[in-house]
Amino acid sequence: MFNRSNFGLNRIICPSYNIEDFFLLANELKLNYIELRNDLPGKGMTDSLSANEIKKLAKQNNLQICSINALQRFNNPEELRIIKDELIHLSEVAKAINCPAIILCPANSNSDFRSKKEQYQDTVIMLKELASIFTEYNIMGFIEPLGFKSRSLSSVITAMGAIREVGYEGYKIVFDTFHHAIGPDNLEKLRNEYDMNLTGIIHLSAVTVDLSTEEYKDEHRNIDFINDKLKSKKQLEYFANNDYNGIISFEPFARDLQELNKGELKNRINMAIKNLIPIE
């Protein structure tokens, strides 16, 4: 069974906050984990604070920085040198701030004309190529399948197969409730094929708009789990019933949530946790 100690915040929930205020928000909510990002305009991963300043902030607020989001297009061998250089940079930052993992996002483009077989083979090739960097920095790689139609890796089962083929223990999977709902897997398939031990983190959000699944976009992701069409609570129930006791990080992109004042945002997050615990 999950409790508040399992939950964390991805910085996308309040991208306008400076990093000190983001840490403070998580602390005031009595959460244990935060995820940083490298894609927030004008912010950088650490808002130009030094590694020592970031570590001090984390300690003061009783927080673990659990990941940096993300190394993009990690499974595109045509960009091998660029991807390796970016991973080295991310790994240097992660190691300096005591962050144990980097999220790996697959190529997601309508101009990707590789076959599914080629995309899988390239995923394996790149995971093998990048493993030495993760080993050197003692950082883990969390692979995040994306459910969008333009994605090159959409299934946690496929990601699991790639990890096993590579044979490197430093890789785990990001289970994202949004991408699971719009992707090819279902809970029955997970029950039969998925290895729960390969889950590194769960990304959690909800969708309430009246659209078809194919029309869902990141901007629709909120934390209203009462009216959630993703059925994220049911997805979490599956993990709870299979002894997952790891990190669950809120990752909503909805602008109306991001623009709430601090008091309203805290109320929404507390309400979301209340609606999810206990998971019945």
Predicted regions and their residues:
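Histidine-acidic metal/acid-base catalytic patches
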Residues: 1-8, 16, 20-30, 55, ...
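Active-site-proximal loop/turn and secondary-structure-junction residues that shape catalytic pockets
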Residues: 13-15, 38-40, 71-74, 106-110, ...
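Conserved beta-strand positions in the central sheet of alpha/beta enzyme cores
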Residues: 35, 67, 103, 142, ...
